[in-house]
Amino acid sequence: MSIEAGHPGISWTLQFRARIDGALIELHSADDTGWRLFIRSSALFLEGSTKAMSFALDMEDTASVTDGTWHSLAITATGAGSKIFLDGYQCFSTTADLSPAASGPEATLELTPGAGIDIRSFSTHDSVLSPGEILALSPAPTPLIEFAAAHLSDYDVAELSELTAGTIFARYRVRGPGQHGTILAAGGGGTEQLNLSVTEEGIEYKVLGRRGEWRTFTAHGHWDQGHWHDVVVRVGHGAVQIYVDGYLEAHLPGQAFFGSVDSLDEVVIGQDTSGSRLFGEVRNAALYSSVLNDSQIKKLSSVAPVDTQCLFDAGFHDSISYRIPSLITLDSGVIVAGADQRETIAND
């Protein structure tokens, strides 16, 4: 489609699934301007030019989008710049206007999925969608298994037995300060070998290793006030990461999941495998066979989106990366400016 000069803004939304690097979408024009968004090294990459500028932007924080699961993507573009959203939350912004109007009146956007990449639910919006609207259009990740009782069926337990990576989600509360207990546990052959608990130290995730030694991963903090909390344990890429209420609280080296449980035959919530119950309740829980990204985890906890706009696309002397200066507008209308004080290299 074509947009006249002076446009109020435009948005595109779609869903994609990728198992390999390759192209996603591309904007063509009658001259040499235009851009393409593709996957490189399992992360989103945007490069091209408009009538005003050229750009090549590596969205490294989106790494691992080639996991074979569906992801939502949104782009908004105005004369003030453009923003890219992954799974409902903004993941990057640029000063470039990615709209067709910035590349010429005949510019058109095309879907160009490469081999091993699927695209669905593509839509064009003749306005700039708000972060809230984009979040509402983004579906939550689909769990492999949801708990409908305090324990899983034998069939569902078998589905987990070979998983070496994935994600655990649980929403719990205890009855008040100083009350703790097990949120989720798993075992095999009568022995508990995996446990997720709220303790006086914080959130503790531990798995019994093959040499009979417990591997313990802890997010230190206090989540025992009696309020509802969302706990996510993300296991993959060589680490265990623990999120509480949508935010990362611990990144710990090591990888241990249900596949580490010898002869797995039991998975329970709200108690350990011997029946000792949490001093509170687990309202709902789910298990994912994929390693959810930050945006998907925030979506599970209904974290409000943050709207940001970059000031520069590169540092001095063409530095590809730089320490980001920032401008924050408070509710009072006061603008707070922040920047790195170092001046020794161009990145500063």
Model-derived regions: residue spans:
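Extracellular glycan-associated modules
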Residues: 1-298, 302-303
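Asp-box/BNR beta-propeller blade signature and adjacent active/binding-site loops
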Residues: 300-348
